[in-house]
Design a protein with these regions (language model features):
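Gly/Pro-rich turn-and-neighbor structural signature
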Residues: 167, 243-244, 250-261, 288-431, ...
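Contiguous, structured surface segment used for ligand recognition
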Residues: 22-178
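Bacterial Sec-dependent N-terminal signal peptides
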Residues: 1-25
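The substrate-binding groove and active-site-proximal loops of carbohydrate-active enzymes
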Residues: 128-131, 192-195, 199-220, 237-246, ...
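C-terminal non-catalytic alpha-helical accessory regions
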Residues: 159, 163-164, 511-660, 745
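Extracytoplasmic
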Residues: 666-883
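Structured mid-domain segments that build the active-site/substrate or prosthetic-cofactor binding neighborhood
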Residues: 232, 237-240, 246-247, 403-407, ...
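An acidic-aromatic substrate-binding cleft motif
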Residues: 153-210, 216, 222-242, 432-435, ...
Length: 883
């Protein structure tokens, strides 16, 4: 464009210098006052971008042109015309953007010295997208695509493009600012058989000349280009590549080249140090020798040298430290991370030696001091033991803390045996910063979790906000398994990583779910589909399908049937929605909602039928044979549902639901799905009468949000977290970083007058002792009596986690306290007082003699209102299907 033409548009230039707004909607599909027409009447559009801009930016522009064509029908082309309708460029590379800044047409202060920031502004009849660097510009390009109607999941979940004949840009300057979390990414892990089978079929090495056909097996740069683009559209920048049977760097040398070109920072997992993939060692283990730094240092150092030499010119974040061979603890057997035997002094000294030598290698290979090259040390599994004993790394190294593989944060910066009254971020700040490695997929004890998304939305939000509030804001990475079917957790996780403050309120994640569903399924269906997504993640979070068995839920009192019916109702709603939604949305709906709901509903019916078969068989009931038939039908239907998923969009996603999930008898997956065992009765075995039925009372079950009264702390308030936990919701004192002094919550209920003592079951989220290593505490009392202090997670150590309660993966801790100082009245009050932060209260059960163990801790007792004329309470506290 001619600069004097732009300079004369005084009003437009002045508006540019107004404070840039967060990237709200800057695209309109109808003409308004002050709007700029971008696309109309199928007219071709030229986009001006300097050819010497970053290659990744040029790639993104080509994607934008394709997006424009799909939305509007308008063709686009890259050119150098000064009057081009759209101008795109990076401040550090584009002479056009530099000239615009020099002429004060764009405000250089918005970009100079910024990281991954873009601004989008209108000047005259042109739209300008300018970025501070290659990722900033790319994010700006894809933000335009998103607002045009191209979901980041357009390719990866077949979300349709929204068609528009006319597109206008609103006047003003828009931005999303800089990201809060510097490294934001995912880990493709546990990728066999699903992802590995899919990539081998869809990205054959025969169509990728740079790939080694004997090694890559589809994990080549043709595949990774799709992953990189998804990450960039989600404003992510970091990836740990698939590594079970593959070596990202070695199997296709173009993998790392394309990653760097597109702007993706590569890393390696917690047991793959110095930019080397495990397979690069495992394939040559015979000639390499033992993966033992104490006995094989020279060979391992040479191995490390090669990794840094290969990665030194890229942005790779270097993992340092070392674990055992194949995700094992130091000294353990390959793949056996459960066989950890501590030798504290020996391994701490060995780690210190490893750190020192690795940093020397980095210095030698890069020609720069080690502190100039970003590095990360993962405090994963047994490594936390040494960290707690005082093992340290240099100040410039990023320390990545981890969850327990099941979505519960293990430790936060500044944690100590006695914890802290309140958190001061300044006390834990370090140059390298803090990171978090979080799981929505896992392989290991007590069972793998690979088949389904079982992470409740509320739980992911709560734990990542916990991380952020404790200063973990340098790196967030999510273990996503095969990527599908974890689309929504990925989206939420990465959205939070960009700006956690936008998710500060305890219902913010619901707004995100609604926006995601509006993008995926259209505004008319957004509320109903968001409800489906919310409920299925909540239901799935109760227990993983791999751990579901006939004894998980109480069969005798109807709890198991209640849960089965909840899933059936949800499935019915999903089918109705599928039939009513537009045909163009159905492929996306099938992947994101219909299959996850139907497959899990069928799984519950399968295991319920097995439980009923066992019960009826033992009691000689003829129905045993009918329930055995149901098991057969459900088992066959599981495969039918899988086949249906694999046929979506002409078989685009074939193999991605190949994961076995029925028939676990140990932590590792069965080689094939195994039909649950059933028994059948012959005619002479069928019992003739003699059944006795009973009704039991003797407990009060209370949802945590139904408190009688509450008292906030000075700097913290009780918050209700909707959909959290196994049934309805949870309450938590937030922010966790503030002191809890003065806070309490009271629950009022009625008991028979002859009750002398009760057992109070307090059900909390399985919060690990991340802050106070000796355990987090609360106090409980009844009717103003002496409070009893309860340490509810002090024995949740790495060594005995799975023995402490059913399994940590159930995300529940149940503590039982017997109280006898009961007033001689009909109405009573239990008071719960948090002593340490981080307590997430889900349910309270008052047992006065009739409670039997239940997975959902009983249906909530009838609610009684003291002023029934003002507010008549429903008998059922939470009619979930009608919400």
């Amino acid at each position: 464009m001619k600069m004097h033409k732009l300079a004369c548009i005084v009003v437009c230039i002045l508006t540019t210098f107004l404070s840039a707004k967060a990237a709200d909607q800057f695209i309109s599909f109808s003409k308004q006052e002050g709007t700029v027409a971008l696309f109309q009447n199928n007219k071709a559009v030229e986009i001006k971008v300097d050819q010497n801009d970053h290659p990744g930016v040029l790639r993104a522009v080509k994607s934008l042109i394709a997006d424009i064509k799909e939305v509007t029908g308008c063709s686009g082309q890259i050119g150098q015309n000064e009057n081009a309708r759209i101008i795109i460029g990076s401040l550090d590379k584009s002479s056009t953007i530099q000239q615009l800044a020099k002429k004060k047409i764009i405000d250089i202060k918005e970009l100079k010295g910024k990281t991954e920031k873009f601004i989008i502004t209108t000047v005259g009849d042109q739209l300008i997208i300018a970025g501070s660097d290659k990722r900033g510009t790319t994010y700006g390009i894809y933000e335009l695509s998103r607002q045009l109607g191209i979901s980041p999941w357009h390719w990866w979940a077949d979300v349709p493009a929204v068609k528009h004949n006319e597109v206008y840009a609103l006047s003003g300057t828009y931005t999303d600012g800089e990201p809060v979390v510097r490294y934001r990414g995912i880990f493709l892990n546990d990728e066999a058989p699903c992802l590995s089978g899919w990539v081998a079929e869809k990205f054959p090495d025969s169509e990728c000349p740079s790939a080694n056909p004997n090694l890559a097996h589809g994990f080549n740069h043709n595949f990774y280009e799709k992953v990189f683009e998804l990450l960039l559209r989600l404003k992510a920048n970091y990836l740990w590549p698939a590594m079970w049977g593959n070596a990202f760097y070695a199997d296709d040398p173009m993998n790392s080249v394309v990653a760097d070109e597109m702007g993706i920072i590569m890393g390696t997992s917690h047991h793959e140090p110095m930019a080397r993939n495990h397979q690069e060692w495992a394939r040559h283990r015979e000639e390499n020798g033992a993966w033992d730094y104490a006995t094989n240092q020279k060979v391992i150092d040479d191995f490390f040298h090669e990794g840094i030499r290969r990665a030194k010119n890229n942005e790779d974040l270097i993992t340092i430290g070392m674990r055992g061979d194949g995700d094992a603890a130091m000294g353990g057997k390959e793949g056996h991370d459960d066989e950890f035997v501590s030798q504290d002094d020996y391994y701490i000294k060995l780690y210190e030696k490893i750190f020192k030598n690795q940093r020397q290698i980095i210095k030698e290979e890069t020609g720069k001091p080690a502190e100039k090259r970003p590095q990360m040390w993962a405090i994963y599994k047994e490594v936390q033991h040494y960290y707690d004993l005082g093992l340290k790394v240099p100040e410039d190294v990023l320390i990545m803390l981890c969850d327990d593989n099941w979505g519960n944060i293990r430790r936060v910066p500044g944690a100590s045996p006695e914890g802290m009254a309140s958190f001061d971020k300044k006390l834990v700040e370090r140059k390298g910063g803090w990171g978090m490695y979080y799981h929505v997929d896992y392989v290991g004890a007590p069972r793998n979790s690979k088949w389904a998304n079982v992470t409740p939305i509320a739980h992911l939000w709560e734990q990542m906000m916990l991380s952020y509030r404790y200063g973990i804001d340098r790196l967030w990475i999510l273990n996503v398994g095969d990527l599908k079917p974890m689309e929504y957790p990925i989206d939420l996780f990465l959205s939070m990583a960009w700006n956690p403050e936008q998710f500060a309120s305890s219902d913010s994640f619901r707004e995100h779910t609604l926006a995601f569903c509006e993008s995926a399924f259209g505004k008319d269906h957004s509320k109903q589909t968001a409800r489906l997504m919310e409920l299925y993640s909540t239901y799935n979070g109760r227990v993983t399908p791999e751990m579901l068995n006939p004894r998980t839920y109480n069969l005798a009192n109807g709890e198991f049937l209640q849960v089965v019916n909840e899933y059936k109702a949800l499935e019915a709603d999903a089918i109705r929605e599928y039939n009513s939604i537009g045909a163009e949305y159905r492929d996306a709906f099938h992947q994101l909602l219909l299959f996850p709901i139907q497959s899990m509903a069928n799984m519950y019916e399968l295991i319920y039928a097995q439980a009923m078969n066992q019960f009826c068989y033992i009691n000689g009931m003829a129905e045993a044979n009918e329930w055995a038939d149901v098991v057969d039908v459900c088992f066959d239907r599981d495969q039918q549902l899988t086949d249906g998923y694999h046929s979506i969009n002409g078989g685009k996603w074939n193999h991605l639901m190949d994961q076995t999930h029925i028939g676990y008898f140990m932590w590792q997956q069965p080689p094939t799905n195994i039909k649950p065992q059933t028994n059948r009765l012959t005619a002479d075995q069928i019992r003739d009468g003699g059944f006795i039925l009973s009704s039991k009372v003797g407990y009060v079950s209370i949802e945590a949000e139904h408190y009688y009264s509450k008292t906030n702390a000075k700097d913290a308030q009780w918050n209700v977290i909707p959909t959290y936990g196994r049934t309805k919701s949870a309450v938590a004192l937030m922010p966790y970083t503030a002191a809890t002094e003065g806070a309490s919550v009271n629950y009022k209920f009625e008991l028979p007058k002859d009750v002398k003592s009760v057992k109070v079951h307090v059900i909390t989220n399985s919060t690990l002792p991340y802050l106070r290593a000796n355990g987090h505490r609360y106090a409980v009392s009844i009717d103003g009596g002496t409070p009893v202090e309860v340490n509810y997670n002090g024995d949740c150590t790495e060594e005995n986690t799975y023995h402490t309660f059913d399994v940590v993966a159930t995300r529940i801790i149940e503590t039982i306290t017997e109280l006898s100082s009961i007033a001689n009245t009909e109405t009573h009050t239990v008071t719960i007082t948090p002593i340490d932060g981080g307590m997430v209260l889900e349910k309270i059960v008052i047992d006065y003699g009739g409670y039997e163990k239940q997975h959902l801790f009983g249906t909530e007792s009838s609610l009684k209102n003291e002023n029934p004329n003002e507010w008549p309470m429903p008998q059922r506290a939470f009619p979930r299907r009608n919400q």
